[in-house]
């Protein structure tokens, strides 16, 4: 979608909220590659608990995405967004103070409870006209995906200067700036019908019935789960491989080129999304992801890890952008927040399950973890086996 198709007001809003959510995502993801290794320095740590510390963020994100989505449908997006971001800030401060693995798990859980991504997607979708939504959501999804991916490279550079503990403080400052930017610069025009309206259980039940009765919507939820399961599993493994090849401080040598190439790939893909090839691109992306993971079997080769990371990152960023875009395309306006809450919940359940499974199997079956991720990626192809985009 060319930016010239947006009005000045729409473009300013879109850029502001995309950058704000992108910075929030970057700050939250920056420490992710170091959680599995940092956990070893904490009291009572085990590989399984390290996996839980990495993945619990995704679990609480999953639990709270739907309530936050429903809440935003009733009282508006801005207040819910600000409330959720403040939860993240408190969680980061607790992580900074954590001396044992259990307190870190608690902190990560609290960070995840600020489940605002669905709210952000709903706000963007409701702020532009119908014909502009695919382009707007592609821009939002790409910025968030790129921010999350590039944070892995940025994180390794920052870690050369700061300890993981102090990185939590840096992330706190970044996210507080996001909170201020949303508070001061973004205004929401809420329909009067939603101001102060109580949450009606019948309306919520009807919304769930319509959404979950749509086969494509259900498959998109499964696609989101699979994509995030693989992503979180891969980012449990790669830092441990690279710790022996480049050291954690050298991870940028892998992630920086991977992110740059993935961004170029995503820019090319957007034009095909606008032409209606979203589902076919999902299939191709899962195939590329599976091939990329296959390169990780040669875990001692810098170049194999690099090629695998590039292919994986291309697949991940494309899927992260397309899946919510298609979901918003088929969801009705009146329960868009609920729809985004559901699909983001499935994504974050995947973010929780991926590292927990990887952590539980890691000490004895490293190759089995890779095989599981490849099989799951190939199963992801089945989620796009339909040509119908019936609205729900």
Task: Give the positions of each predicted feature.
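Residue-level signature of mid-helix packing/kink "hotspots" within the transmembrane helices
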Residues: 58-66, 148-149, 259-267, 351-352
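A late C-terminal transmembrane helix in Major Facilitator Superfamily
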Residues: 335-363
């Amino acid at each position: 979608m060319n930016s010239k198709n947006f009005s000045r007001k729409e473009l300013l809003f879109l850029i502001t909220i995309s950058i704000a959510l992108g910075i929030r995502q970057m700050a939250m993801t920056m420490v992710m590659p170091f959680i599995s290794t940092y956990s070893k320095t904490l009291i009572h740590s085990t590989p399984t608990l390290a996996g839980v510390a990495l993945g619990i963020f995704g679990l609480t994100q999953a639990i709270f995405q739907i309530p936050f989505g429903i809440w935003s449908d009733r009282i508006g997006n801005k207040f819910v967004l600000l409330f959720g971001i403040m939860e993240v800030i408190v969680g980061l401060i607790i992580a900074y103070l954590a001396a044992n693995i259990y307190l870190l798990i608690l902190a990560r859980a609290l960070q995840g409870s600020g489940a605002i991504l669905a709210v952000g997607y709903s706000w963007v979708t409701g702020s532009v006209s119908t014909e502009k939504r695919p382009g707007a959501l592609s821009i939002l999804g790409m910025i968030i995906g790129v921010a999350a991916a590039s944070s892995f490279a940025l994180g390794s550079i920052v870690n050369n200067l700061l300890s993981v503990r102090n990185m939590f403080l840096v992330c706190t400052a970044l996210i507080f700036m996001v909170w201020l930017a949303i508070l001061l610069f973004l205004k929401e025009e809420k329909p009067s019908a939603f101001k102060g309206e109580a949450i009606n259980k019948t309306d919520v039940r009807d919304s769930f019935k319509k959404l979950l009765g749509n086969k494509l919507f259900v498959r998109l939820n499964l696609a989101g789960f699979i994509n995030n399961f693989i992503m979180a599993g891969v980012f449990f493994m790669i830092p441990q491989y690279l710790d022996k090849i480049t050291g954690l401080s050298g991870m940028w040598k892998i992630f920086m080129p991977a992110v740059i190439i993935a961004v170029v790939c995503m820019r090319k893909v957007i034009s095909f999304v606008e032409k209606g090839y979203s589902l076919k691109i999902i299939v191709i992306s899962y195939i590329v992801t599976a091939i990329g993971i296959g390169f990780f079997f040669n875990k001692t080769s810098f170049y194999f890890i690099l090629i695998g990371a590039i292919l994986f990152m291309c697949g991940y960023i494309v899927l992260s952008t397309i899946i919510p875009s298609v979901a918003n395309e088929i969801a009705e306006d009146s329960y868009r927040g609920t729809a985004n809450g559901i699909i983001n919940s499935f994504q974050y359940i995947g973010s929780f399950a991926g590292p927990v499974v990887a952590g539980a199997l890691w000490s004895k079956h490293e190759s089995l973890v890779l095989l599981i991720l490849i099989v799951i990626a190939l199963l992801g192809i089945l989620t796009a086996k339909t040509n119908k985009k019936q609205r729900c």
